[in-house]
Amino acid sequence: MGLQFILGDATTDHAGTMATMVQANLQADSQNQIFYLVPNHIKFEAEVDLLKRLRAQAASVNGVYAQNRVQVLSFSRLAWYFLKNTALYQQPRLDRASNTMLVAKILGESKEELTIYAGEAHNTGFVTQLADQLSELVTGRITAEDLNTTVAALTPGDRHRAKLRDLGIILDHYEAEIGPYATNASLLSGLQQVMRNQDLSHTFIYLNDFNVFSASETGLVETMIETAAEVTVSLVLDKPYPAAPPVAPNLFLPAGRLYHRLYQKAKTMKVPIRLDRFAKPRPLSEGMKHLADWWQTSTNLQPQAPAQTAQNKEVELAVATDPYHELRTVARQIYQAVRQGARYRDFLILARRLDPYAAVIPAIFEEFNIPQFTDLERPMKDHPLVVLIESLFAIQDHDYQYQDVMRLLHTELLLPENMDIAAFRDALDTTDNHLVRTGITGKKRWTQTDPWRYFQRNPNADDSQLDPEADKTAQINAIKTLVADTVPQLLRQWQTAKTGREAAASLYQWLQTTGVIDQLNVWRQTANADGDLSRSQANEQAWDTFTQLLNDYATILGEADFNRDQFRELLAAGFASATYTQIPSTLDSVVISETGLVRLAKAKHVYVIGATNTAMPDVPNDSGVLNSEERQLLAAQLPDDRFLPEQGPTTTLGDPFINYLGFMAASEKLTLSYPMQNTQENSENQASPYFRQLAQALQLTPATWAPAGLGTSLKAVLGSQRAMLSDFVRAAGEAQHQKLPLSRSWQGVLASLKQTTLAPLAQKLAGSLTYQNDPGRLDPTLAVQLYGRDMNVSVSRLETYYRNQFEYFLKYGLLLQPRPEFELSPADTGSLFHAVLDQYLTQLRDAGQTLADVTAADVAAAVPPLVAAITKRPGYEILGSTHRMAYLTSRLSRLLIQVLTNMRQQQRRTGFRPMRTELQFGRIGDTRGLPGLSWPLPHGGRVNVRGKIDRLDVYRESDAQRFMVVDYKSTQHRFDDSDAYYGIALQMLTYVEAMANVPADPPFVPAGALYFHLQDPKFKFSTDLDLDIDRLKAFKYLGFLVAKDGADLAAVDKTISAETGGRSMMVPLGFKKDGAFNYNQSNILTPEDLSAYLLHNQALIIDAASRILAGDIALAPFQYGQESTVISNSDYQSIMLFDPATGFDHYNHVPKLKRKEVLGRVTTDPTQIPHHRQEDSQA
């Protein structure tokens, strides 16, 4: 037995020296066995490297070399090698996920004994942290008794007592619970026992690339030293420290402390200690040698030699604008180097923390076609299988809440039979919209036997439905059936399960019978077929983790009474700590890692990115369960063979060493960079002290890494075709912004790219530079396909066209609709008002009555039952969804009573009576009403206009039936002549024309078109307040009346007349004392005026239909003055992206006209369409 140290700083070749010793051992005796131990994450690389070196030394023929007496292993694989046939190794493994589950169980069961940790069993984040801490304590060989001894040594009032006491209780239970399991600590302990009982006289053990050991690993190494023929430990260390450990500041502090500990232990065990050997120098560039010297003298605070500029070419510093362009520049340089003969494996990219770069790494390296392996653990908690299981518990907890059910379905692991994934996604989107618009929730609704019906809530009153109901009804019922046939079955089994094993088995069987396991296999096979091994293994590992957790649960709590909440918490805790194991997709790839992970020093060029003052040196993390102060308290009570890793401020002493190893992993060149912008916190970064000191000591001027621009030479940004396209777009965009010509070289880049497979993308991106927000025109043939040769339209559609042609195309051509939401909207209340008013007035008409014939009490009694009946119809679910909505429904009922009561008052003052309500003309959906309006179009086809009149009031005379069109509005409306002239208010004139065209005897003669405001008016209190009169004024009809003189309107308001004069409180009508109309109080059109308006209205309808079928879809929203409501109130802003500030987008800017001007235009030529003038860029 014996102990041999191999020393040398990072400029030496430790692996080469050890390979020589290994070869000598192999040649010395054919019985000699070699165990070469390295950290687990570099085992494969180390094995390949050692075998290559042994082959070179053996000078094998044909380059073939085989060796069965050399084992390159990690500590865990060494345990497997010696223990694989023992009972200990056959015990179930307690990995991180199952360990977390076990700790969650212990916390739940021991909460009565605890004080500060009593309520933490449900906190999965803390449980994961506590599980790691307990594992660390066991690996540190620290027992519950050690914690209790520490507690006893503290003063009664010490603030650490309660925490350490709780931890001691938990650790005591933990030690008892882990007995049946194989843990890392128990395997290392078992390995020690086996090695003590085996003949290792021909066993030579080499340890390389370790700078620190845990207490369990230290104990194992000490056993090796005591039992093996020889143990050789290689340390990155400049000199031995036999008598005392190094004292800070010292670059080699961690390795020096390890040397001292092992040396003293060997001395205590009376094991021979060989003379230290020093590794030979490895091939390094002069710049890397100089860097090593500077790093050592700088850290050790020693005087430094003057810098030699010539020596520093191999060390570069750079400042990037942001993390994205920092990493992109690195990728570009690697791409260019490989084109000059380098290999991808020659490059290593390191960061102290990779988090700021994690999201952009895949995209950047894919853009440059560079294979890369990111050596970073990825958490498993977001895998669809984990989400599906979490959703099942949530569905049961929240009674089939919308978010939980949709989260389960969006995993795409639970699919209906005989439905492909595309059809499923479409059906799921439809169901999603249906649930949002109807508010369906709860097990009762999901499992009801009656099928759901898809419908559009409160469609436009005069418009047909846009959604194909039958197809969508089939889709939503396919999803409903999927949930109803699968989820309740499992939840019932959990409710009736007696033991934990029953519940675990039911979950596994459910996943099997519902096809979840099959779908996971499909994913894995698809990933394999695509060559995506990482994705394939992720699915496999997620399933393996899940089955292991189920097995652990069955082992730990299988026979106990089933507790569903505990089952959920244990699975959640297990998944929270689970991570994916990753493998490189190819041997020749760029490795991306963190400086805290040991790497073999085999790269030629190392890039260290993210060198900011918060990363280098690293900010100490003292957030564990045991902080640095508590660790020191504990260490004071422990013997030397029991200890925990350092944490907190003391770790900064080893930070220079960690970075030194990372920097010196390069043999030829080091590039150190940092981004000026912290994109995660939207702040500015400062350079690391290492960066600043290097710049000063080596007289280096940092390069600037910025995005490609006009001034960037083409040679500097040469990259893959896709990367060059990105750079071209940026450079060309800069040229356009600065109004400068684009250089010929950049123009040549685009020309070259258009000859490659990227041509379509290049053309598209290049076109974006000159893009103007102009939708152009539709081909007329396509327009006819969209809308039909014979256009069947509603008035509101045509008004939309005149407000914004492009919005019309989006809404009625592409049928785009905003996502409906489950909320009480004006459309809901308006729809309810219309329905109640229609039903009540129809009931009165059928009974031969009018509102004037009933009492206020009759109205108050009739409305609530009507409201109750209507709110039970499909589409009104929201009004009964909550107590608040029920209250709002009662308020709406009271408002309707008030509205009808005031209509009653109005009808007592007028001779007009409601003849019909909800009177339809033209075809709406599958129903027909009065004849619609129809006109031929200039280029063939017809335009057919449909609509629905809210109420038609009629006064019968001997030679005419005078009618007034009444339209209910939720906001106050007036008839605006200018709006009517420009086509944005076609409704009233169209309704008047539809009624005037109805054949009747005597004929229908228009008397007016009025708006009725459905409102809940409020009045200021005053002593002379007369509510009846004030309400009458508040509910006054607004619009226009038609008459030659006052006699035509005698029946409109019988309380006034041309003879007596006065002003109406219910319609826009007033008379002067001489009997003439008072136009300040009246809104009167003569029959001749109305005829001109109707002819113009007809011309507008024909013009709109013609332009729609001609493909006119200009993005030129209608505007008076500086109004922007057409855009600001639109549901399609995010599609239109209309912005006049760009100089490209323009309004259809028109002057606001008064009636006199409108009449002058329409009487001159009613068919003349208003000239649409676009504002200039200055308007």
Curated annotation (Swiss-Prot):
EC numbers for this chain: 3.1.-.-
Protein name: ATP-dependent helicase/deoxyribonuclease subunit B
Record GO terms (molecular function): 5'-3' exonuclease activity; ATP binding; double-stranded DNA binding; helicase activity; hydrolase activity, acting on acid anhydrides
Organism listed in the record: Lacticaseibacillus paracasei (strain ATCC 334 / BCRC 17002 / CCUG 31169 / CIP 107868 / KCTC 3260 / NRRL B-441) (Lactobacillus paracasei)
GO biological process terms held by the UniProt record: double-strand break repair via homologous recombination
Family annotation (SUPFAM superfamilies): P-loop containing nucleoside triphosphate hydrolases (SSF52540)
Subunit structure: Heterodimer of AddA and RexB.
UniProt similarity note: Belongs to the helicase family. AddB/RexB type 2 subfamily.
